[in-house]
Amino acid sequence: MATPHINAEMGDFADVVLMPGDPLRAKHIAETFLEDVREVNNVRGMLGFTGTYKGRKISVMGHGMGIPSCSIYTKELITDFGVKKIIRVGSCGAVRMDVKLRDVVIGMGACTDSKVNRIRFKDHDFAAIADFDMVRNAVDAAKALGVDARVGNLFSADLFYSPDGEMFDVMEKYGVLGVEMEAAGIYGVAAEFGAKALTICTVSDHIRTHEQTTAAERQTTFNDMIKIALESVLLGDKE
């Protein structure tokens, strides 16, 4: 039945949901890549859709910005609508010079300055990692599509406008590939409620060089990332 944030019924969502931050990007993904699309959520403007990709039922829905927002939606999708796999498809900022604008990054793990997972994990550090099979399927899908995807750690930040520029040096030293705001929270929710999760990001801006894509490009041109996510779902069905 409907929750305070999702006005859908059991069965409206597929067992796999792709989740961008922007609900308009969710609409674009549904209209561009899925067939037989229908809207299944519009509460607070957080649009959700279900359709088929190559005959496979798949849903796509926005999760908003930051760990608090995405944690609400992912928790409800898992516990109230039977969703088994979450694939975040979003943008990130690069901190390493060998990571370029529009590179695709597969988030094997996610560091964070948020305390959300410590609260969940009784004030201990929780290793926020993606599901291994989902990582492997995304890597295989990228190879099949001819996309040179990077695999490694992301950093999920609580602050978009961070005053601590020195932290970027620490991230670079530790090999962090990109900075975003949700992966660690989504991985924590998935672990807590017995689901599986993965984050795939496209580099939308470079923190070192100040290169950036436009808002319109972020909404419509990150197609490689979406194709990798969708094809990885099909590979997962063969396991």
Curated annotation (Swiss-Prot):
Any one Gene Ontology BP term: purine nucleoside catabolic process
Coiled coil: none
One MF annotation (Gene Ontology) recorded for this entry: purine-nucleoside phosphorylase activity
Domain of life: Bacteria
CDD domains, per database record: PNP_EcPNPI-like (cd09006)
Methyltransferase as UniProt keyword: no
Disulfide bridge positions per record: none
Positions that bind phosphate: G21, R25, R44, R88, V89, G90, S91
Record InterPro entries: DeoD-type (IPR004402), Nucleoside_phosphorylase_CS (IPR018016), Nucleoside_phosphorylase_d (IPR000845), Nucleoside_phosphorylase_sf (IPR035994)
Entry's Gene Ontology cellular component terms: cytosol
Quaternary structure and partners: Homohexamer; trimer of homodimers.
Function: Catalyzes the reversible phosphorolytic breakdown of the N-glycosidic bond in the beta-(deoxy)ribonucleoside molecules, with the formation of the corresponding free purine bases and pentose-1-phosphate.
Name of the molecule in the record: Purine nucleoside phosphorylase DeoD-type
Organism: Salmonella newport (strain SL254)
Native organism taxonomy: Bacteria, Pseudomonadati, Pseudomonadota, Gammaproteobacteria, Enterobacterales
Gene this chain is encoded by: deoD
